[in-house]
A protein has these predicted regions:
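Long, low-complexity, intrinsically disordered N-terminal extensions of eukaryotic proteins, enriched
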Residues: 1-2, 147-149
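Structural signature of beta-strand start/N-cap positions in the alpha/beta core
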Residues: 24, 51, 89-92, 116-117
């Protein structure tokens, strides 16, 4: 288990597998999951010649539990800081669910020449119900859900 500390002082857990000179894949988990989600895929990717990095989002898994910075843009910043910390180049980002949303936020915030490809899986186009997306959380719009907050 390894950690790096973000610029807002959160310890993020990560693991780095394979040969450091190989093309890196960062596997990014979904909401309430940990890097354990990816353990079944690591050996296959490493045997195929990739360097594989897994990590836990802040307040997930073995990363520090905090009550701040729990936004997609902050998670994207954490991802950027991990890439910078490991001095990665030519990175492939693979995200599941909230991990896919983290990648989308990352792409919105950074024009990063270090990312060569992105793969997203199982991420809805929006969290809430809208006129063009009827499958939002609990079948509610943001306005309808705000009544409960």
């Amino acid at each position: 288990m390894s950690f790096f500390t973000t610029n807002d002082l959160v310890k993020i857990n990560f693991h780095d597998y394979g040969i450091q000179l190989n093309q890196p894949l960062i596997l990014i988990g979904g909401y309430s999951s940990s890097e354990v989600t990816w353990f079944a895929q690591i050996e296959t990717f490493v045997n195929a010649g990739y360097r594989v990095i897994t990590y836990d989002h802040r307040s997930h898994g073995d990363s520090q539990q905090v009550d701040y910075g729990l936004t997609l843009h902050r998670l994207a910043m954490d991802l950027k800081e991990l890439i910078d910390y490991l001095q990665l180049k030519n990175v492939v980002l693979i995200g599941h669910s909230m991990g896919a949303a983290t990648i989308m936020a990352y792409e919105e915030l950074f024009t990063d020449e270090n990312v060569s490809a992105i793969i997203t899986e199982d991420q809805a186009p929006t969290f809430f119900k809208s006129a063009d997306w009827l499958n939002g959380q609990y079948g509610k719009t943001l306005t309808e859900l705000s009544v409960f907050i």
